[in-house]
């Protein structure tokens, strides 16, 4: 990707910027500002946006913050790069009171790219710019349905032509909601008004399971078997859902046994119908096969995958790699062909707080993104290596210490929780945080 150029970028307070150089005067050489590592900003200094580092950058708020969301695949086509973009998200709130929570469908559209700085011109040109700015304003349509209790995780799947959302509630239930009507109304302002007035209060889940012994966060739909679902709770239990005729599910009451603490994340294999991975607060990552009895289904285990809780995992759709992020702030890449060894093939330590989300790029096999409680989103490429024969060396000691595979550091969010690459819009990354949603694409990916 020619745009990478070996440059690394950061942003703060919602404003992306290129890595900034500070002159320390006679006390030493200039240094590049590194998130979480300094040098600290001086009095009156702040980080400002460098729009040239971003192809696309938009923010949105929905009232109560959302701990989790998922991208809804649409019928607008794949490999969409032409701007403006349109996209659909399904998200769940974490409101202050249980009865104030909502499951939401968002339609974000008219998402234009970043613009070069304005040049000096006549008053007529200024008027044209104002009219153009009005036409370029991003738009948001929002359909909401009541949900009693905060929503810990949302995952969307298509059952044939029917979109559904699996929803983990802080009240200990897992519910499935039909999304067809919500998708219809966010495309039609008149239908949306009727829905909000007459229908939204009556929307109920099409299925609910209360067999978990408490709340949980882990949930994943099978990408190979429509309707097959896994849910994991904070009591170390994992349950398998099997779809039945008539739009219902049979949930196996026998949990998969192996973890000793909370199950934090689940990922189905993208290549095998019966295999899945799990990670836990017990520091382990496990590989399972549902063809075996739940008590004997754990086939492979790395007992000490991280120094502490393993928070998130992502199974590559293109390579036999599993990506993990933990409370120790590290990112690890596991080659599943060598998983028995218990050693990752790559370890990266850029985040200075727990990793909250990881995901492989859906089109580029070596690229992934991660978010952390340090309010950083990092983009990585395993294929990037410094050429020792080029003679090029990094003169700044701060940059020299950074992993070669680190492409981009995005900041400016508060309390980052989750991120996803858009599967139909290459390079577009979406995140949710206490500060709201951010949709962006960098020059690096």
Curated annotation (Swiss-Prot):
InterPro entries hit by this protein: G-protein_beta_WD-40_rep, Glutamate-rich_WD_repeat, Histone-bd_RBBP4-like_N, WD40/YVTN_repeat-like_dom_sf, WD40_repeat_CS, WD40_repeat_dom_sf, WD40_rpt
Function: Histone binding-protein that regulates chromatin dynamics and minichromosome maintenance (MCM) loading at replication origins, possibly by promoting chromatin openness.
One of the GO BP terms on file: ribosome biogenesis
GO cellular component, one term: nucleolus
Region (Disordered): 110-141
Keywords: Chromosome, Nucleus, Phosphoprotein, Repeat, WD repeat
Cellular compartment(s): Nucleus, Nucleolus; Nucleus; Chromosome
Ranges for the WD repeats: 211-251, 258-298, 305-344, 350-390, 411-444
Modified residues (Phosphothreonine): 10
Cystine pairs: none
Protein name, as recorded: Glutamate-rich WD repeat-containing protein 1
Residue stretches of biased makeup (Acidic residues): 121-134
Single Gene Ontology MF annotation: histone binding
PANTHER family referenced in this protein's UniProt entry, alphabetically: GLUTAMATE-RICH WD REPEAT-CONTAINING PROTEIN 1
Presence of keyword Nucleus: yes
Keyword rRNA-binding: no
Highest taxon listed in the record's lineage: Eukaryota
Lineage: Eukaryota, Metazoa, Chordata, Craniata, Vertebrata
Assembly with partners or alone: Interacts with METTL18. Interacts with CDT1; origin binding of GRWD1 is dependent on CDT1. Interacts with CDC6; origin binding of GRWD1 is dependent on CDC6. Binds to histone H2A-H2B and H3-H4 complexes.
Modified residues (Phosphoserine): 119, 122, 343
